[in-house]
């Protein structure tokens, strides 16, 4: 078989048949823990004191308080943004109390908070961190830079959580690392009667049984692509960029640009939400399950373009401010 079958022993629940403890939630804990450890490491090396506008030392309580505000901002922002941008039936607009309701409306079973948006989480983190630094008289940009260098490695585990949930998978592919994901909804399977489906299945070594109505084709494991590029690679870039930082805000702007660039291109491998489809497309009939044109642009890619523009704009503005400030101080 020229594809990989998703491991049958992987389950969303840490304890089988006990839905309250899931790998996805545990990966969030791992992600925040790694970010916290890397943040503390930089503080101990004096990297925050060096760029801070106050001489008051950073305490353990300061870091914990900052992380508490930031994490709350991430969770609230990610959930609210997801329900307001990615849900088109306006259910949460009519009944906003359901945004944080963890039970199924149909069965009453515990399902957790399904739907968390990265872009909303980023906005929430900036708001939460900004409120904390403002109320404590700290430099927001200095703290944001340290957080930016700490975040991507933890983010890696968030995407691994998506993989363990077998969600946010990519478009169909015939490359050897294509993966056949379990529990794919019927809407994401393909009619066995279609000649191209049978030909595609034969090409990847899938035997279509006689009488089968639908075929589950292999897809890009886009969660792993994102974990590697938006997590590990971006973290390496930012961790090294700490040495060439010349002004506050440089690292957080670099993070925003870097994430936007990586995510924009990986979106071409990831399948867009079926109910949203493409925001822009050269042809109105482009299927979301197959890459056909670079001009097929998803909602996530539009948000990434906005991130890139905001990050570059921030770099330009902060660099110009730093140069003017340096000239002013030199004249004093």
Swiss-Prot record:
UniProt EC number: 2.5.1.145
Upper lineage: Bacteria, Pseudomonadati, Spirochaetota, Spirochaetia, Spirochaetales
Binding site for a 1,2-diacyl-sn-glycero-3-phospho-(1'-sn-glycerol): 159
PANTHER family cross-referenced by the UniProt entry: PHOSPHATIDYLGLYCEROL--PROLIPOPROTEIN DIACYLGLYCERYL TRANSFERASE, PROLIPOPROTEIN DIACYLGLYCERYL TRANSFERASE
Localization (cell): Cell inner membrane
Broad class of enzyme this protein falls into: transferase
Gene that produces this protein: lgt
Topology relative to the membrane: Multi-pass membrane protein
Superkingdom per UniProt: Bacteria
PROSITE patterns on file: LGT
UniProt keywords, alphabetically: Cell inner membrane, Cell membrane, Membrane, Transferase, Transmembrane, Transmembrane helix
Signal peptide: none
One GO CC annotation: plasma membrane
Pathway annotation from the record: Protein modification; lipoprotein biosynthesis (diacylglyceryl transfer)
GO biological process, one term: lipoprotein biosynthetic process
Gene Ontology molecular function, alphabetical: phosphatidylglycerol-prolipoprotein diacylglyceryl transferase activity
Keyword Cell membrane found: yes
Functional note: Catalyzes the transfer of the diacylglyceryl group from phosphatidylglycerol to the sulfhydryl group of the N-terminal cysteine of a prolipoprotein, the first step in the formation of mature lipoproteins.
Keyword Ribonucleoprotein applies: no
Stated name of the protein: Phosphatidylglycerol--prolipoprotein diacylglyceryl transferase
Family: Belongs to the Lgt family.
TM region(s), chain numbering: 18-38, 66-86, 111-131, 249-269, 302-322
InterPro entries per UniProt: Lgt (IPR001640)
């Amino acid at each position: 078989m020229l594809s990989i079958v998703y491991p049958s022993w992987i389950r969303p629940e840490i304890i089988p048949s006990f839905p309250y403890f899931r790998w996805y939630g545990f990966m969030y804990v791992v992600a925040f823990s790694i970010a916290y450890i890397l943040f503390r490491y930089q503080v101990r090396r004096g990297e925050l004191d060096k760029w801070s506008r106050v001489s008051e030392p950073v305490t353990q309580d300061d870091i914990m308080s900052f992380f508490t505000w930031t994490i709350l901002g991430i969770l609230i922002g990610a959930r609210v943004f997801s329900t307001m941008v990615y849900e088109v039936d306006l259910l949460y607009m009519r009944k906003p109390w359901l945004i944080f309701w963890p039970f199924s409306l149909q069965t009453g079973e515990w399902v957790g908070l399904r739907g968390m948006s990265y872009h909303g989480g980023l906005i929430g983190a900036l708001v939460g961190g900004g409120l904390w630094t403002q109320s404590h008289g700290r430099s927001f940009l200095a703290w944001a830079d340290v957080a930016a260098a700490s975040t991507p490695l933890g983010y890696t585990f968030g995407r691994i959580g998506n993989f363990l949930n077998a969600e946010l998978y990519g478009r169909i592919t015939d490359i050897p690392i294509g993966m056949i994901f379990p529990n794919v909804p019927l809407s994401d399977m393909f009619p066995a009667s279609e000649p191209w489906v049978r030909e595609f299945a034969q090409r990847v070594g899938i035997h279509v049984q006689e009488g089968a109505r639908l075929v589950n084709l292999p897809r890009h494991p886009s969660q792993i692509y994102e974990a590697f590029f938006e997590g590990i690679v971006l973290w390496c870039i930012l961790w090294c960029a700490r040495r060439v930082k010349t002004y506050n805000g440089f690292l957080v702007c670099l993070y925003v640009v870097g994430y936007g660039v990586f995510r924009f291109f990986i979106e071409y491998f990831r399948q867009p939400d079926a109910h949203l489809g493409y925001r822009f497309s050269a042809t109105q009939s482009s299927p979301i399950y197959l890459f056909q044109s670079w001009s097929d642009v998803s909602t996530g890619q539009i948000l990434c373009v906005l991130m890139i523009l905001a990050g570059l704009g921030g770099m330009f503005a902060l660099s110009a401010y730093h140069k003017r400030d340096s000239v002013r101080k030199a004249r004093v």
